[in-house]
């Protein structure tokens, strides 16, 4: 692919292995934006964990203070009644039990998040082969199995992100869009890192947040100097 002079200059400006202060890193990301769409801002966090060990797996969710900039479609499995009404009032795009399961089995899977109350999991369990591979299976560790579906829907619609360390011990997550204010992106990143620190496995030894890098959808990765972040 032929690079423009501008893109070459941007790539040269990012020194491999150098950690940049968060403010400078965000400016580099915004300068590097080249797509005709509004790019997402992604973070990759290498953790000091051995995910092969069951007591060092990291999985959770964070409500980003500035949201994600994405419209989120939410389906909720909940028996009819007050909780179902709460979910609808909170903005759920679909609510049901067996009827909702039948629609999903027929191919209606255009959802970003699936939430369920504990008593609805008997229905959701039958959809494991459909929801599991898509990362949609409700799980209490990320707040998608909840006694309060209304609150869970509000969180999902307000910018809650879910994450899980991959086989290499890396968390990948979207923390906003390149058109966000610099401060909003910084606050979102700090909120995510603070929550990750809170769920650090006790068996994890040594440096936990080993490497934090930001990138836009089409831009270069920029390693962050963690001392420029507020993580308390």
UniProtKB/Swiss-Prot annotation:
Q: Which UniProt keywords apply?
A: Repressor, Ribonucleoprotein, Ribosomal protein, RNA-binding, rRNA-binding, Translation regulation, tRNA-binding
A Gene Ontology molecular function term of the record: rRNA binding
User: Keyword ATP-binding: yes or no?
Assistant: no
**Biological process (GO) annotations?**
regulation of translation; translation
Q: Which InterPro entries match?
A: Ribosom_uL1_bac-type, Ribosomal_uL1, Ribosomal_uL1-like, Ribosomal_uL1/biogenesis, Ribosomal_uL1_3-a/b-sand, Ribosomal_uL1_CS
Q: Name one GO cellular component term.
A: cytosolic large ribosomal subunit
Sorted alphabetically, which Pfam families does this protein's record hold?
A: Ribosomal_L1 (PF00687)
Entry superkingdom: Bacteria
Record-annotated membrane-spanning stretches: none
Question: Among its keywords, does the record have Transcription?
Answer: no
Subunit architecture: Part of the 50S ribosomal subunit.
Q: Which family does it belong to?
A: Belongs to the universal ribosomal protein uL1 family.
Protein purpose: Binds directly to 23S rRNA. The L1 stalk is quite mobile in the ribosome, and is involved in E site tRNA release. Protein L1 is also a translational repressor protein, it controls the translation of the L11 operon by binding to its mRNA.
PANTHER family in the record, alphabetically? Answer: 54S RIBOSOMAL PROTEIN L1, MITOCHONDRIAL, LARGE RIBOSOMAL SUBUNIT PROTEIN UL1M
Q: What is this protein called?
A: Large ribosomal subunit protein uL1
């Amino acid at each position: 692919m032929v690079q423009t002079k501008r893109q070459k200059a941007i790539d040269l400006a990012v020194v491999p292995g150098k950690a940049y202060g968060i403010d400078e890193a965000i400016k580099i990301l915004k300068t590097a934006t080249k797509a005709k769409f509004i790019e997402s801002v992604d973070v990759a966090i290498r953790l000091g964990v051995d995910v092969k060990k069951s007591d060092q797996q990291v999985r959770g969710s964070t409500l980003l203070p500035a949201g994600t900039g994405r419209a989120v479609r939410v389906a909720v499995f909940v028996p009819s009644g007050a909780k179902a009404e709460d979910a609808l009032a909170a903005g759920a795009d679909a609510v049901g039990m067996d009827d909702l399961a039948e629609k999903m089995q027929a191919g209606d899977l255009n959802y970003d998040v699936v939430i369920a109350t504990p008593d609805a999991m008997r229905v959701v369990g039958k959809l494991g082969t459909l929801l599991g591979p898509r990362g949609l299976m409700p799980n209490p560790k990320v707040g998608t199995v909840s006694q309060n579906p209304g609150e869970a829907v509000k969180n999902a619609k307000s910018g809650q992100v879910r994450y899980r360390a991959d086989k290499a011990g890396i968390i990948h997550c979207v923390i906003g869009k390149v058109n966000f204010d610099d401060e909003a992106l910084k606050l979102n990143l700090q909120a995510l890192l603070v929550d990750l620190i809170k769920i650090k496995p006790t068996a994890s030894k040594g440096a936990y947040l080993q490497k934090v890098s930001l990138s836009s959808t089409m831009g270069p990765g920029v390693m962050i100097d963690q001392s420029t972040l507020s993580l308390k």
